[in-house]
UniProtKB/Swiss-Prot annotation:
Processing after translation: Disulfide bonds.
Disulfides per UniProt: 121-135, 128-140, 132-167, 134-156, 142-154
Annotated InterPro entries: OXYTX_ICK (IPR044061)
Region of interest called Linear cationic cytotoxin domain, as start-end residue ranges on this chain: 59-104
Name of this chain's protein: Spiderine-2a
Family membership noted in the UniProt record: Belongs to the spiderine family. Cationic/spiderine subfamily.
GO cellular component: extracellular region
Length: 171
Protein backbone atom coordinates (compact mmCIF):
# COMPACT_ATOMS: atom_id res chain seq x y z
CA UNK A 1 0.00 0.00 0.00
CA UNK A 2 2.80 2.41 0.95
CA UNK A 3 4.75 1.47 -2.13
CA UNK A 4 1.75 2.13 -4.36
CA UNK A 5 1.20 5.56 -2.84
CA UNK A 6 4.87 6.48 -3.16
CA UNK A 7 4.89 5.28 -6.76
CA UNK A 8 1.74 7.28 -7.47
CA UNK A 9 3.34 10.34 -5.91
CA UNK A 10 6.50 9.97 -7.97
CA UNK A 11 4.49 9.53 -11.16
CA UNK A 12 2.29 12.51 -10.35
CA UNK A 13 5.33 14.65 -9.51
CA UNK A 14 6.95 13.64 -12.79
CA UNK A 15 3.80 14.46 -14.72
CA UNK A 16 3.46 17.87 -13.07
CA UNK A 17 7.07 18.73 -13.84
CA UNK A 18 6.93 17.28 -17.35
CA UNK A 19 3.84 19.28 -18.21
CA UNK A 20 5.63 22.62 -17.76
CA UNK A 21 5.90 23.00 -21.53
CA UNK A 22 2.40 21.68 -22.10
CA UNK A 23 0.63 24.03 -19.69
CA UNK A 24 -0.94 25.90 -22.51
CA UNK A 25 -2.45 22.71 -23.90
CA UNK A 26 -3.70 21.33 -20.59
CA UNK A 27 -6.60 22.82 -18.81
CA UNK A 28 -5.90 24.51 -15.53
CA UNK A 29 -8.30 22.16 -13.73
CA UNK A 30 -6.27 19.08 -14.69
CA UNK A 31 -3.09 20.64 -13.31
CA UNK A 32 -4.97 21.59 -10.17
CA UNK A 33 -6.15 17.97 -9.72
CA UNK A 34 -2.58 16.69 -10.03
CA UNK A 35 -1.33 19.19 -7.48
CA UNK A 36 -4.15 18.25 -5.08
CA UNK A 37 -3.24 14.57 -5.44
CA UNK A 38 0.38 15.38 -4.60
CA UNK A 39 -0.69 17.42 -1.58
CA UNK A 40 -2.95 14.59 -0.38
CA UNK A 41 -0.12 12.08 -0.63
CA UNK A 42 2.22 14.40 1.25
CA UNK A 43 -0.37 14.94 4.02
CA UNK A 44 -1.17 11.25 4.59
CA UNK A 45 0.92 10.01 7.52
CA UNK A 46 2.61 6.66 7.02
CA UNK A 47 1.64 5.58 10.54
CA UNK A 48 -2.04 5.61 9.63
CA UNK A 49 -1.34 3.44 6.59
CA UNK A 50 0.60 0.97 8.76
CA UNK A 51 -2.27 0.89 11.25
CA UNK A 52 -4.75 0.12 8.47
CA UNK A 53 -2.56 -2.71 7.19
CA UNK A 54 -2.19 -4.15 10.71
CA UNK A 55 -5.95 -4.01 11.20
CA UNK A 56 -6.52 -5.88 7.93
CA UNK A 57 -3.98 -8.50 8.97
CA UNK A 58 -5.74 -8.99 12.32
CA UNK A 59 -9.08 -9.51 10.58
CA UNK A 60 -7.65 -12.29 8.40
CA UNK A 61 -7.70 -15.68 10.13
CA UNK A 62 -6.58 -19.05 8.87
CA UNK A 63 -9.28 -21.70 8.66
CA UNK A 64 -9.34 -24.12 11.56
CA UNK A 65 -8.24 -27.65 10.73
CA UNK A 66 -10.03 -30.60 12.26
CA UNK A 67 -7.07 -32.93 12.73
CA UNK A 68 -9.27 -35.83 13.88
CA UNK A 69 -11.37 -35.68 10.73
CA UNK A 70 -8.24 -35.38 8.59
CA UNK A 71 -6.67 -38.42 10.28
CA UNK A 72 -9.81 -40.52 9.81
CA UNK A 73 -9.91 -39.60 6.09
CA UNK A 74 -6.26 -40.63 5.74
CA UNK A 75 -7.03 -43.92 7.47
CA UNK A 76 -9.98 -44.55 5.11
CA UNK A 77 -7.83 -43.84 2.06
CA UNK A 78 -5.17 -46.24 3.37
CA UNK A 79 -7.78 -49.01 3.86
CA UNK A 80 -9.14 -48.46 0.34
CA UNK A 81 -5.60 -48.71 -1.00
CA UNK A 82 -5.10 -52.02 0.79
CA UNK A 83 -8.38 -53.32 -0.67
CA UNK A 84 -7.35 -52.25 -4.17
CA UNK A 85 -3.98 -53.96 -3.77
CA UNK A 86 -5.81 -57.27 -3.20
CA UNK A 87 -8.03 -56.86 -6.30
CA UNK A 88 -7.04 -59.26 -9.11
CA UNK A 89 -7.63 -56.67 -11.86
CA UNK A 90 -5.37 -54.20 -10.09
CA UNK A 91 -2.74 -56.93 -9.75
CA UNK A 92 -2.96 -57.58 -13.50
CA UNK A 93 -2.59 -53.88 -14.22
CA UNK A 94 0.38 -53.73 -11.88
CA UNK A 95 1.96 -56.72 -13.62
CA UNK A 96 1.36 -55.05 -16.99
CA UNK A 97 2.91 -51.80 -15.74
CA UNK A 98 5.93 -53.59 -14.31
CA UNK A 99 6.41 -55.50 -17.56
CA UNK A 100 6.23 -52.29 -19.56
CA UNK A 101 8.66 -50.56 -17.20
CA UNK A 102 11.08 -53.49 -17.41
CA UNK A 103 10.92 -53.46 -21.20
CA UNK A 104 11.60 -49.74 -21.29
CA UNK A 105 14.40 -49.99 -18.71
CA UNK A 106 15.98 -52.96 -20.48
CA UNK A 107 16.88 -50.65 -23.33
CA UNK A 108 14.56 -52.03 -25.99
CA UNK A 109 16.01 -51.57 -29.44
CA UNK A 110 12.80 -49.89 -30.61
CA UNK A 111 10.90 -47.07 -28.97
CA UNK A 112 7.08 -47.36 -29.02
CA UNK A 113 5.73 -46.02 -32.29
CA UNK A 114 8.80 -46.79 -34.38
CA UNK A 115 8.72 -49.46 -37.07
CA UNK A 116 10.76 -52.61 -36.49
CA UNK A 117 12.71 -54.36 -39.22
CA UNK A 118 11.63 -53.45 -42.73
CA UNK A 119 8.53 -51.55 -41.54
CA UNK A 120 6.71 -54.88 -41.27
CA UNK A 121 5.76 -54.64 -37.59
CA UNK A 122 5.55 -52.22 -34.67
CA UNK A 123 7.36 -52.14 -31.32
CA UNK A 124 6.00 -53.01 -27.86
CA UNK A 125 3.64 -50.38 -26.48
CA UNK A 126 2.54 -49.12 -29.90
CA UNK A 127 -1.20 -48.83 -30.57
CA UNK A 128 -2.54 -51.60 -32.77
CA UNK A 129 -5.78 -52.81 -34.33
CA UNK A 130 -4.91 -56.50 -34.73
CA UNK A 131 -2.00 -58.95 -34.39
CA UNK A 132 -0.72 -58.12 -37.89
CA UNK A 133 0.31 -54.65 -36.68
CA UNK A 134 2.69 -56.18 -34.13
CA UNK A 135 5.90 -58.17 -34.60
CA UNK A 136 5.56 -61.98 -34.92
CA UNK A 137 6.87 -62.48 -31.37
CA UNK A 138 4.27 -60.03 -29.99
CA UNK A 139 0.47 -59.86 -29.99
CA UNK A 140 -2.12 -57.07 -30.02
CA UNK A 141 -3.58 -56.83 -26.51
CA UNK A 142 -6.86 -54.98 -25.92
CA UNK A 143 -7.45 -54.44 -22.18
CA UNK A 144 -11.03 -53.18 -22.65
CA UNK A 145 -14.13 -53.77 -24.74
CA UNK A 146 -14.39 -52.27 -28.22
CA UNK A 147 -16.65 -49.39 -27.12
CA UNK A 148 -13.82 -47.97 -24.99
CA UNK A 149 -11.24 -48.24 -27.78
CA UNK A 150 -10.59 -44.50 -27.75
CA UNK A 151 -10.18 -44.41 -23.98
CA UNK A 152 -8.11 -47.55 -23.44
CA UNK A 153 -6.46 -48.46 -26.75
CA UNK A 154 -4.99 -51.80 -27.78
CA UNK A 155 -1.20 -52.08 -27.83
CA UNK A 156 1.49 -54.52 -28.92
CA UNK A 157 2.62 -56.71 -25.99
CA UNK A 158 5.09 -59.53 -25.40
CA UNK A 159 3.48 -62.87 -26.31
CA UNK A 160 2.90 -65.07 -23.27
CA UNK A 161 2.13 -68.78 -23.11
CA UNK A 162 -1.66 -68.29 -23.29
CA UNK A 163 -1.52 -65.60 -25.99
CA UNK A 164 -0.27 -66.04 -29.54
CA UNK A 165 0.06 -63.83 -32.58
CA UNK A 166 -2.75 -65.01 -34.89
CA UNK A 167 -1.59 -63.05 -37.92
CA UNK A 168 -0.68 -65.30 -40.88
CA UNK A 169 3.05 -65.24 -41.67
CA UNK A 170 4.18 -62.82 -44.37
CA UNK A 171 5.07 -64.34 -47.71
Amino acid sequence: MKFALVLLGVCAFYLVNATGDLETELEASELQELQEALDLIAETPLESLEAEELEEARKFKLPKINWGKLASKAKDVYKKGQKLAKNKNVKKALKYGKQLAENLAAGEVHEPGTPVGNNKCWAIGTRCTDDCDCCPEHHCHCPAKSWTFGLIPCSCQVTESDKVNKCPPAE
